[in-house]
Amino acid sequence: MVAELEFEKPLVELRRKIQELKEFMKTADVDLSSEIEKLEARLTKLENEVYANLTPWDRVQIARHPQRPTTLDYIERLFTNFFECHGDRCFGDDEAIVGGIADYDGLPVTVIGHQRGKDTKENLRRNFGMPHPEGYRKALRLMKQAEKFSRPIICFIDTKGAYPGKAAEERGQSEAIARNLFEMAGLTVPVVCIVIGEGGSGGALALGVGNHIHMLENSTYSVISPEGAAAILWKDASLAQRAAETMKITAHDLKTLGVIDEIIPEVKGGAHRNADEQAKEIDRVLRASLKQLLALDGEALVEQRYEKFKQMGQVSFLQETIRAR
């Protein structure tokens, strides 16, 4: 059963009523088809109203949904012959990041992504999708391998952020993230990044320096969580909803600001409602991106990536220049 979110409460009672009538029809000699059809029509109308008017905080809840498809869910649906690679060849293997070699419609590719768990046991094993330095170093090892063998790189971003623990800092968390940013900027193969859930801080950006950056419609991408921003700005984490509306963290906001290239539509209610259909939407956008990028040589790919990131923040720079005059 799909867990309902806070803003979906108006829909819950209607869904429950429809289900009760369907169950009653199975056991009683009564035809309630007409009543059920009316309720389903009412439910559809209400769903359209709710999902068409989602607030940034509503989208944060969807991005964090415990049943939202993960990197491995999409790998299973989009790629064939996936062979997972382990370890950073320096310290160990971080299961908060998965990566390996796969075929995408006959094209050899390298796939890398954050991986959170679906239950408590798996979340503990994968550290809730928050990587240690060895996770980022594993990702970079696979990226350099992909460059050596001319394989396109596809990154799935889904993390609250890099793990901030003492051990992670001792092993060079900030250096690992910075090294990824530096090296990804100069990769001579196509890099396509897709935010599929939460894109939190440097932990997300360490897999986010791509030629094309796409976001699922209800995903988020930000330097800090709404709770963290509220705690810093107003000394009150309970004001997270206000922070979410202020921070411009949604796909629509970031498309307007030029941070991302395309918004990938989600199935009604969020990707967790139908992972198969959601994978088809990702496939459509990914296929178009690779077709465009594979036409460029290595030097052109690096230049395109450089120009893309250089243009971010250009509007604010111009505004500051005008004020200075």
From Swiss-Prot:
Q: A single GO CC term, please? A: acetyl-CoA carboxylase complex
The catalytic activity of this protein is classed by the Enzyme Commission as: 2.1.3.15
- GO annotation terms (biological process): fatty acid biosynthetic process; malonyl-CoA biosynthetic process
Is Signal found in the keyword set? no
- Compartments where located: Cytoplasm
Q: What is its main location?
A: cytoplasm
Q: Which GO terms describe its molecular function?
A: acetyl-CoA carboxylase activity; ATP binding; carboxyl- or carbamoyltransferase activity
SUPFAM superfamilies with a match to the protein in the record: ClpP/crotonase
- What InterPro entries does its record include? Acetyl_CoA_COase_a_su (IPR001095), ClpP/crotonase-like_dom_sf (IPR029045), COA_CT_C (IPR011763)
Catalytic activity reported: N(6)-carboxybiotinyl-L-lysyl-[protein] + acetyl-CoA = N(6)-biotinyl-L-lysyl-[protein] + malonyl-CoA
Which positions fall inside the CoA carboxyltransferase C-terminal domain? Answer: 35-292
User: Which UniProt keyword terms apply here?
Assistant: ATP-binding, Cytoplasm, Fatty acid biosynthesis, Fatty acid metabolism, Lipid biosynthesis, Lipid metabolism, Nucleotide-binding, Transferase
Q: List the pathway annotation.
A: Lipid metabolism; malonyl-CoA biosynthesis; malonyl-CoA from acetyl-CoA: step 1/1
Keyword ATP-binding in annotation:
yes
Q: What class of enzyme is it?
A: transferase
HAMAP family in the record: AcetylCoA_CT_alpha
Q: What does this protein do?
A: Component of the acetyl coenzyme A carboxylase (ACC) complex. First, biotin carboxylase catalyzes the carboxylation of biotin on its carrier protein (BCCP) and then the CO(2) group is transferred by the carboxyltransferase to acetyl-CoA to form malonyl-CoA.
Assembly: Acetyl-CoA carboxylase is a heterohexamer composed of biotin carboxyl carrier protein (AccB), biotin carboxylase (AccC) and two subunits each of ACCase subunit alpha (AccA) and ACCase subunit beta (AccD).
Q: Which family does it belong to?
A: Belongs to the AccA family.
Q: What is this protein called?
A: Acetyl-coenzyme A carboxylase carboxyl transferase subunit alpha
